[in-house]
């Protein structure tokens, strides 16, 4: 508030060798290499995406090594691979460190460098889908006379999974699963499509036939594409709602799977909407009290854990664009109207028990006075920055009580209808600097899911009186418009 890594099951080391063989014939054969000989492994792709990384990622990779990984899919399926992070030392024609993707029916593709580097050839957002049921990734680094970690290149992180044969349309899809049900001689192949519950639900389901490349048909021969939509507001490990005490507690993994940790001008929070949007406060992007803002400030987003160090290990989710509500005025220090923003991520995020979106509100009853909700965040606590996700159970406060509290203190802050207040004047609470942008959630008894009704916006001091939140309901149409590409 202002002023106010599941790793894929793989091994890089060959099961036949625990170190560098000392035999002279091997040294003669591989004398050109400085390190261990080629290491190989075989991975079995599954419906859900799994991670494959360079050795030691995200720490800088060592020099003078070669690793080949064969990724195989079950009969009737292909392998899809896409890079989420790629950082190799650039070189002309990728003659130095490189990653090579190869499979039957296609020429090998070699990559190096980083996105935007003038030298090198990074893969960018390209996805690789094997023509058969296997794909090979080869990672090579050139020998070096320098310290093997004396460079700043961390390697790569890729996601791989199975897709149906003749797959031709991009998926974000952690979401879609396919189960082959064709018998010998069947043509075309029939695939029972389904969504990965409980993280996704189907908008169109059933047995679809892969008739032509990129076309699915149902039993009535009508074209239909399975749409898997993220399930919001239903944690696999929900918070225990029977607690009676107010105040701060440490969150368990999976309690608040929508929680994001942001680092822009400082630490902040946010909440996942769908599988590629972060809901946050505008003032975390354009602070009210900042005199010398740097242009092109980096926006870092982390998800998937309750410990900051573990979130950092999982890696930053690059942001494609930032959308701030037009009503937000950075130069009006006492007016936080329109304190809401959306961050669109470059890639959709595979959902799972520790990464799930929160729902949006749809009615005023979710704001009634006395309704208890939860606010979570990585903000300061007792003057110290926390490294663990904390949460507090707090009631929605009467609007008139908050107005009176502000007037008593002769505060100039605007308390508009697009805001609401939370807390109890007689109780201490823990919302403070670093919590900005995190959300206040309540349980919707009718829809049976958690709803983000508020965004931590502003307050007077820490742990005292009331805190003031952006009323998300007032901005639902704007949020949906941005997410649907209308705004």
From Swiss-Prot:
Keyword Hydrolase: yes
Glycosylation sites per record: 147, 166, 242, 296, 363
Record-annotated Peptidase S1 domain positions: 245-484
Active site: residue positions: 283 (charge relay system), 339 (charge relay system), 436 (charge relay system)
Tissues and organs where the protein is expressed, per its UniProt entry: Highly expressed in placenta, liver, kidney, pancreas, moderately in lung, spleen, prostate, ovary, colon, and PBL, and weakly in heart, skeletal muscle, thymus, testis, and small intestine.
Cellular component, GO annotation: blood microparticle; extracellular exosome; extracellular space
Keyword Glycoprotein found: yes
Limits of the Sushi domain: 165-230
Annotated EC: 3.4.21.-
Top EC class of this enzyme: hydrolase
Highest taxon listed in the record's lineage: Eukaryota
Main location, first listed in the record: secreted
A Pfam family recorded for this sequence: Trypsin
Signal sequence extent: 1-35
GO biological process: complement activation, classical pathway; innate immune response; zymogen activation
GO molecular function: serine-type endopeptidase activity
Residue pairs linked by disulfide bridges in the UniProt entry: 94-112, 195-228, 402-421, 432-462
Record-stated family: Belongs to the peptidase S1 family.
Function: Mediates the proteolytic cleavage of HP/haptoglobin in the endoplasmic reticulum.
Name the record gives this protein: Complement C1r subcomponent-like protein
Species of provenance: Homo sapiens (Human)
Taxonomic path: Eukaryota, Metazoa, Chordata, Craniata, Vertebrata
Gene it is expressed from: C1RL
